[in-house]
């Protein structure tokens, strides 16, 4: 059997309820298409069930503003941090079967961070189209008249030190959603993932 799950409001309780069933599968499809993110600690928790070795996390930075420095025309200053590596889960059995991760242009924020970790761990193939290219952590600006905008506050690198902000995580296998398949209640991206897993 090939297990799959998609939950745009992922949380640990939801995953824990599924995990015993996931362990019984022969392969797993994780679908984070159209997932705008949420709490990055959930992504860290999820990946910890699929790895045997620690995964380094990418360095992130955010601009700092010190009014006096600005008045003296100092160059922009940045706060930088490299979080601790993600460790394998030590309280449960690690899932060792093949995994495919599905992504698209509306995979953002913590969902995209999960994609970064998954790719860094070399845990499986990423199938779909490039992700959105934004880590999230937005600041909201009220523009008035019922309008607003969000601006990303973090600049982040992947686990290998590569840029993905404004670029997206590139899939290993490109698969675009097909309108004809969709109209017939199918999913061409999942079909591509299944074809790949059957070939293993």
Question: What residue ranges belong to the model's regions?
Answer:
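Cleft-lining beta-strand/loop regions that shape enzyme active-site pockets
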Residues: 1-144, 196-198
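Short, intrinsically disordered/low-complexity patches at protein termini
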Residues: 53-54, 63-65, 150-151, 173-175, ...
């Amino acid at each position: 059997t090939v297990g799959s799950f998609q939950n745009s409001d992922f949380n640990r309780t939801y995953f824990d309820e599924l995990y015993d069933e996931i362990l019984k599968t022969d392969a797993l499809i994780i679908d984070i298409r159209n997932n705008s993110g949420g709490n990055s600690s959930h992504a860290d928790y999820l990946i910890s069930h699929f790895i045997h070795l620690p995964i380094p996390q990418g360095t992130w930075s955010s601009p700092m503003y010190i009014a006096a420095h600005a008045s003296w025309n100092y160059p922009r200053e940045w706060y930088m941090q490299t979080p601790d590596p993600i460790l394998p889960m030590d309280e449960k059995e690690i899932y060792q079967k093949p995994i495919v991760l599905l992504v698209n242009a509306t995979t953002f924020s913590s969902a995209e961070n999960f994609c970064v970790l998954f790719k860094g761990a070399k845990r499986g193939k990423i199938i779909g189209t490039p992700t959105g290219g934004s880590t999230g952590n937005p600041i909201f600006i009220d523009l008035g008249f019922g309008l607003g905008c969000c601006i990303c506050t973090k600049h982040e690198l992947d686990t290998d030190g590569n840029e993905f902000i404004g670029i997206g995580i590139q899939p290993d296998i490109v698969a675009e959603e097909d309108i004809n398949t969709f109209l017939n209640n199918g999913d061409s991206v999942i079909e591509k993932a299944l074809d790949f897993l059957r070939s293993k």
